[in-house]
A protein has these predicted regions:
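Single conserved hydrophobic/aromatic residue that forms the stacking wall/gate
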Residues: 1-12
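Flexible "cap/lid" loop of the alpha/beta hydrolase fold
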Residues: 110, 118-149
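Conserved HGGG/HGGXW glycine-rich cap/lid loop of the alpha/beta-hydrolase fold
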Residues: 19-64
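Conserved alpha/beta-hydrolase catalytic His-Asp/Glu region
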Residues: 130-132, 136, 151-209
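Active-site loop/oxyanion-hole signature of alpha/beta-hydrolase fold enzymes
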Residues: 42, 55-96, 263
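Gly/Ala-rich beta-loop-alpha elbow adjacent to hydrolase catalytic centers
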Residues: 97-101, 105
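Short beta-strand/loop motif that positions the catalytic acidic residue
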Residues: 211, 217-219, 223
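Catalytic active-site module of serine/aspartate enzymes centered on a nucleophile-bearing elbow/loop
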Residues: 241-271
Length: 271
């Protein structure tokens, strides 16, 4: 654990991890779908803990935050993050969002413009049609299949994630026990239910141009989950944006290309 941890469970039923460095603008880290704040950022947070303040939040149905079958969406997650930052007394911040986290980050930047100084979107998407999921019904069937699989073989998905981390040399030996335990704590049945309810219907194309924050978009040249052309749909709608592509990276940039990512974050945020 790279930083002090604070839970706001009594108020928001959300788990947060907060690190404070006096005189710095806090960076808010928003994780990917099916992960959590530590699972997504365990290779990033320890290396910047002396350079900047940060807050990492477990979003709904992920990590140590609450689990519920009630319908929720990206905008609700954005509202919760905004409320947490208000409770923490944060009036200006930088935000880093990966995949699903990038969707929440964009919503925050639209809803509360004075709050967001700079925005980093890693493998972002504006909607899940076109290049990736041309048939939403088919994706819903896929999500249903995965949910059934998780009930029959509850360890399958955590084992798959762990295998990927090991094969891609994303975790060193000292992290293996932690990674194994962390992955097996995920709320997979809830996570994949969310896929059908809020990931598929998400569509930000009509309002992305309202975002005013200076933005850095980071993509992976070999990303098969959110290909470059899908992220480019975000880029073309943003007003003030820079793009960095890691040619040999897939979707898991914070796991496989953490040093490249850290270089970009330090330069963009002037850490």
């Amino acid at each position: 654990d790279s930083s002090p941890s604070r839970g706001l469970g009594d108020v928001y039923k959300r788990q947060i991890r907060e690190n404070i460095v006096d005189g710095t603008t806090p960076v808010i880290f928003l994780h990917s779908w099916g992960s959590d704040s530590l699972g997504s950022w365990f290779k990033i947070l320890p290396k910047i803990k002396n350079e900047t303040s940060f807050v990492a939040i477990d979003m709904r149905n992920h990590g140590k935050s609450d689990a519920s079958w009630d319908r929720w969406d990206v905008d609700e997650n954005a509202d919760v993050v905004i409320s947490i930052l208000k409770e923490l007394g944060i009036s200006s911040c930088n935000i880093v969002g990966w995949s699903m986290g990038s969707a929440v980050a964009m919503s925050i930047a639209k809803k509360n413009k004075p709050l967001v100084n700079k925005l980093v979107l890693i493998t972002p998407f504006s909607w899940l049609g076109g290049a990736v999921y041309s048939d939403k019904v088919a994706f819903k069937i896929f999500v249903s299949f995965v949910r059934i699989r998780e009930r029959l073989f509850p360890n399958f998905n955590p084992k798959s994630k762990f295998s990927f981390l090991k094969k891609s040399n994303s975790i060193n030996d000292e992290y293996t026990e932690w990674a194994w335990n962390n992955l097996h704590k995920s709320k997979d049945d809830f996570i994949y239910a969310d896929g059908g309810r809020f990931v598929v219907p998400y569509d930000a194309r009509s309002w992305i141009q309202e975002i005013e924050a200076e933005t850095l978009v980071i993509t992976g040249g070999r990303d098969k989950l959110v290909p470059e052309e899908t992220s480019n749909d975000v880029v073309k709608r943003l007003n003030e944006v820079k793009v960095k592509t890691f040619p040999d990276a897939g979707h898991s940039v914070p796991w496989t290309h953490e040093e490249d990512l850290l270089t970009e974050l330090r330069e963009f945020f002037s850490l």
